[in-house]
């Protein structure tokens, strides 16, 4: 089942401002090998300990619990920005995630509506349109990907709050590994961060 919820955040402008203020790393510089995503992504956002991020992480988890009958899950969360130019850097158009569920919250005002998320469910292609403050959530095992890209700057690019839901033990292991990568990366490659 695919969840689509419009007007998800009461204070979406504050969340967008927070996203614009973060450091990002480009896909080609992400440590640990090749990644399926293209563009710029923050490190996992738990380390910020930000009340706004925690508020929406809890809201997303509660929606997942109610809809998918999940228990004892945790949420990996990132801000992600991609530009029109990133469509040429795609290794694979569609992918799956090794998590129970995944999703995005669109954070670009007045986006290209065709730049949403394509999700394959029961053999059928579903093109969910990009709309500011729209949440989309789906099972991670279903093939999915960005429908199309747009923009060429932090203000005009395709911005999302991207999340992955998994059981708490997997979350702890994954977060520990991500933090180790971040610490190693911070010591030797801080010049590869993309600061707007």
Residue ranges and their predicted role:
Residues 2-81, 88-91:
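Non-heme Fe(II)/2-oxoglutarate
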Residues 82-196:
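Catalytic core of non-heme Fe(II) oxygenases with the double-stranded beta-helix
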């Amino acid at each position: 089942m695919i969840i689509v919820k419009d007007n998800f955040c009461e204070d979406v402008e504050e969340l967008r401002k927070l996203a614009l203020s973060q450091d990002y790393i480009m896909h080609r510089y992400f440590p640990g090998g090749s990644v399926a995503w293209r563009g710029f992504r923050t490190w996992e956002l738990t380390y910020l300990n930000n009340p706004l991020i925690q508020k929406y992480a809890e809201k997303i988890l509660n929606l997942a619990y109610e809809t998918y009958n999940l228990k004892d899950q945790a949420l990996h969360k990132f801000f992600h920005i991609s530009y029109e130019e990133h469509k040429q850097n795609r290794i694979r158009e569609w992918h799956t995630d090794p998590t129970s569920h995944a999703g995005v919250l669109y954070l670009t005002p007045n986006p290209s509506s065709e730049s949403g998320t394509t999700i394959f469910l029961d053999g059928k292609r579903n093109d969910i349109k990009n709309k500011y403050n729209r949440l989309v959530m789906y099972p991670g095992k279903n093939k999915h990907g960005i429908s199309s890209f747009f923009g060429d700057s932090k203000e005009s690019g395709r911005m999302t709050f991207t999340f992955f839901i998994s059981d708490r033990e997997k979350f702890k292991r994954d977060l520990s590994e991500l933090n180790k990568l971040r610490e190693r990366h911070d010591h030797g490659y801080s010049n590869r961060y993309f600061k707007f």
